[in-house]
C-alpha cells in the first residue's frame, strides 16, 4: 500500500506479436490466435513493418477478422521516418477500429503528434523512448496523446513514473507502462495495479 491505498485486483494485458518474426499475414494471424488462446485480452501488431500501405491495410484487416471486433487491436507504427505514412494509413484502417495508434511519428515531434491526433481521430500513444518529466508535460500541454507509455527504466523509476501518472490523470490521459526487460516488467506491473488511469 505504499503506492496506492486502493490497488486494483486485476489488470488487462495485451500481447505484442513482434511482427518482424512473422513473415506473412497468415503466420502473424496464427501467432495472434495462439496468443489469444493463452489468455491475452488484446493484440499489438506492426502493420508497416516490411509492408506497403496497401499491404498494411490487408494485414490489419486479416488480424481483425481473426480476433473479432471485441478484442482490442493495437497498431504500432514504430516511428516511421516518413511522417506522411501515419496520415495515409489512418483512413485505410479506421474501419477496423484500432484500439490505439502507437508512435505514428517520433515521440520528440510533439506538434506532429498533436496534428496526427486531430486529423485521424485515432487514440495516439507515445512516450516509450522519452525519459524526462518536462517532455511528458509538454506532450500533455499540447494534447498530443491519448495514452502515454513511458518506460519505467527510462523515466527514472517508480517516483518519476508516478509523477507522470498523476500529471496524466489531471488531463484525462491514460497510462500504459512500456517495458524493455524483466525488471521493468515487474516494476511496471506494480504501477499498473496502483494507478487509477
Name each model-derived stretch.
Residues 1, 5, 103, 156:
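Flexible, active-site-adjacent loop/turn segments at secondary-structure boundaries
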Residues 1-73, 78-80, 87, 91-95, ...:
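N-terminal capping/lid subdomain adjacent to the active-site entrance of alpha/beta enzymes
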Residues 27, 55-59, 85-86, 112, ...:
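Residues at alpha-helix caps and immediate loop-helix transition turns in enzyme cores, especially N-
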Residues 91, 97, 108-125, 130-197:
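Shared catalytic-loop signature of beta/alpha-barrel
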Amino acid at each position: 500500500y505504499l503506492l496506492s491505498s486502493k490497488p486494483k485486483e486485476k489488470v488487462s494485458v495485451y500481447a505484442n506479436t513482434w511482427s518482424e518474426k512473422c513473415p506473412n499475414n497468415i503466420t502473424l494471424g496464427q501467432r495472434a490466435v495462439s496468443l489469444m488462446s493463452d489468455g491475452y485480452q488484446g493484440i499489438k501488431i506492426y502493420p508497416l513493418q516490411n509492408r506497403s500501405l496497401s499491404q498494411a491495410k490487408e494485414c490489419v484487416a486479416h488480424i481483425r477478422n481473426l480476433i473479432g471486433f471485441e478484442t482490442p487491436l493495437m497498431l504500432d507504427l514504430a516511428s516511421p521516418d516518413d511522417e506522411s505514412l501515419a496520415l495515409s494509413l489512418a483512413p485505410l484502417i479506421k474501419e477496423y477500429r484500432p484500439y490505439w495508434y502507437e508512435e505514428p511519428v517520433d515521440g520528440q515531434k510533439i506538434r506532429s503528434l498533436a496534428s496526427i491526433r486531430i486529423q485521424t481521430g485515432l487514440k495516439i500513444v507515445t512516450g516509450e523512448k522519452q525519459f524526462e518529466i518536462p517532455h511528458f508535460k509538454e506532450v500533455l500541454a499540447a494534447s498530443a496523446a491519448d495514452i502515454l507509455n513511458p518506460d519505467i527504466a527510462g523515466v527514472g523509476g517508480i517516483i518519476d513514473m508516478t509523477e507522470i501518472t498523476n500529471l496524466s490523470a489531471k488531463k484525462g490521459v491514460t497510462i500504459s507502462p512500456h517495458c524493455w526487460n524483466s525488471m521493468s516488467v515487474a516494476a511496471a506491473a506494480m504501477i499498473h495495479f496502483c494507478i487509477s488511469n
